[in-house]
Amino acid sequence: MKQRALALAIKRIIWAELALSAAIAIPAFAQSQPAAADTAAGTTTESKPAAAAAAPASSTAATPATATGNGNVAQLKKFEVTGSLIRSADKVGFNQVQTVSQKDIQNSGASTVADFLRTTSANSANSWGEGQSANFAAGAAGIALRGLSEKYTLVLVDGQRVAPFAFFSNSVDSFFDLNTLPLNSIDRIEIVKAGAVSQYGSDAVAGVVNIITKHDFQGLQLDGSLGSALTGGNGDGTYKFGVLGGFGDLNSDRFNVTAAASYYKSNGFTLADRDSTRNQDFTQQPGGLSLLSPSYWNMPDGTAQPLMGCPPGSSVHPAGTNSIASAGVTGGAVCGTNTAESLSILPLTERLNAKLHADFKVNDATTAFGDFLISSNTSTSNQGVNVVGNPQTPTLVYNPQTKQLSPFNTVVPASNQYNPFGVDTPLTYTFPNAVAEETYATFWRASTGIKGSFNLPNGEWDWATSVSHSQSTVSNEYSNELNAGALNNIYQNGTYNFSNPAATPNGSVGLYTSANNLAISKLDTVDATLATPELFHLPAGDVGLGFGAQFTHQSEIMTPGGGFADGTVINPNLQTVNGQRNVAAVYYQLDIPIIRNLTFSQSGRYDHYSDVGGAFSPRFALRYQPVSALTMYTSYNRGFRAPTFVEDSNSRTLGIQVDQATGQNYTSITEGNPDLKAERTRNLDIGFQVSPTRTTDVGLEWYKIRVDNVIGQGAPSSTVVDPTTGQTLYVNIPYANLGYLDTNGFEGTLRQSLPTAVGMFTLSGDWAYVNSFKLGLPGGAPVNGAGNNYTITQPFGGSFPRWKGNTTLDWNYHKFDAALTWQFTGPYAQNLASQPSRVGSYSQFNLMMTYTGFKHWTIYGGIDNIFNRIPPYDPIFANGTLDQTGYDTSVYTYIGRFAQVGATYKF
């Protein structure tokens, strides 16, 4: 009730703002034309916006405007802003841009870029980190603005597009791995919380994240840190070291070279390292079951019978309380084995990243640049043990000739000496060795270009051109997979003692084998832009105009390797994708002052895709600043999203999904559809920012996003069943254009500084509330996924809390700084399990302290999750097959209380 009341209050604030805007605008339109700018008196002050950007071709290079010589009148300097072609001096533009500094990242306690961005309020739901179990994109992390999943958010590096991670998150979402960049190379991050298709193209529907790196650095800087979990279990020790250096002054030497490199290692941790998961027992939780891996005989009466002697490390437990067994039997008992060490919560990770940037001044108005980024990331995660005969996910064998899957025969014949019944009997059995996935991910990008400016009588024009190539290559190596032939020999010929494997030491010879798959993603880009904020002068201000053109070639290939493609192993990780496309685009932006303080902006982009055709995406925006302390803005966008290669190529993906009706898992093969149409999108944003004093900023925005022709899983084309038992083996599901997705919500920001005799106190907040996330699918009424876990049933989805927010209290006194951060995630309704009916909210407090009193040194340290909070329990994520954490891993990460200490030395 409190949340509904607050949401109602926020809506009323929005309506009040609109009324205020109208009240101020009407007399403004009625007044006479203002005097020309050159008759103004006095001196204006320089105002640098929070969203000053870097220098890509798609966001042209900025040379601050110089004085015009109009007496003593100094011109406001204009800077680049992510989301705009035209330089601006305005602190707040036509949409909300959140700027994150390196200090903000450090104060949050985050160890990596991904850790920080995934905690921002705009990343509300449906995004996945490196800890997701059974994910093709293991070790990688993305961001999903406004809950639209990762394929709707565009991530740029220095304003330029980059190749996505070679595998798809959740097997469907294309995304850029946030772990690619060295943390010490980042200058700031700009987050455009609005649709930006009219400038950036297809995948900027929910917004843009522009990661801007350090340029023109001089000197040498070393930094390092250590971290470790303190309570809640063991594991997750982290080590980080970085070096940043640069030489040359761009103004005096006419060149600068800046280089950064970093090494990061996390030891990761498993279920065995956390108090809440080490026993694999959720029977004390509402609707909870035991997650011990079972071994049992399937009796003719539908009950389970444990082996005549449980394997070493196992003990007898009721079948009805076992998550896996209870899905296939009606009673009895099983041998349960604790396999907590076999499933990782976070993988063991090593990352080595490096970046080199060079600028060369050709003349006072022209600069050439070159940039090279390379990243090598290795992650190792345990993917659990093989439970052959698992009733939740049938054991399948792939036939490379027919390209079909068939059931593995789990019936132990009467002739097998280890069958005690004398009749053919099905056996569900846990093989003890954990499947380990080792991921080798290499990313590199090379770009070069030239940018500059020239003067015409009416003003200065900025221009830029660039060309770049980026590539992601990812190899997944799997060990301890089960060889189908050797497994069949064990079941049929009695070479393996199920109760006492040590008694048959040669029984498992050839059973454990390896397999792999490979993916390569490439992107070639050519950009050119031309823009001026001073096309000509009107009584109300300057008219701005910008043009851009872009050509890209995209390609993606995924191939199952040995072990999977040849049918050697059971339950193969199959995902095949082979696609490429050319995209040509032209775009523009026109800013026109209507009256003083009221500006209209119109922009548009035409894209032509070689596989799905062309689309025009317009944007219309207004910005009104009646007084210097208040800025109001609104924008309306129409856009589109082209299908990803996994959606519109002849792809096939074997996976496990959650049944909407029962909450149970089932196996599926999702098939690409070359006949898919592009999704069509509409965005509406209305917001304001008020700064009544130099130390106060308050912002609020309401947004609405509509996506038509939503691409999702269509009706099953076929269902394959076991002819012997009638059990569903898997379901073939094609991608299709379905109904619509409609979401709306609020985002608010606050920053208040208070200078006192004992230092400067700053309170800042970043909060989001999702009012609605409706999915309108054929054949049924729309379903609102906000505030519940319905979207888990979609291929991209996770649970969707309505509320998410961060609040930080920072205290700075002389050389000392302390920041206390409260991270909040709201509750959500439990729709897919009978109990509990509600999953509770979650609060985490982090404390970071920094001291700069020693010459050249910055010493810092802190504690994350001070009170060692455990994420709220959700039985959907304690089901024995997909996840065993007991919480939604797309929303939370349970590291426990975590301490870190580090230092930076500047020469």
Predicted regions and their residues:
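Surface-exposed, low-complexity loop segments enriched in small/polar and acidic residues
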Residues: 170, 275-282, 311-349, 355, ...
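C-terminal beta-signal and adjacent terminal beta-strands/loops
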Residues: 771, 824-829, 851-907
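Outer-membrane beta-barrel translocator/receptor signature
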Residues: 172-176, 184-187, 198-209, 215-277, ...
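Transmembrane beta-strands of outer-membrane beta-barrel pores
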Residues: 226-230, 247, 263-267, 374-378, ...
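N-terminal plug
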Residues: 49-136, 144, 152, 157, ...
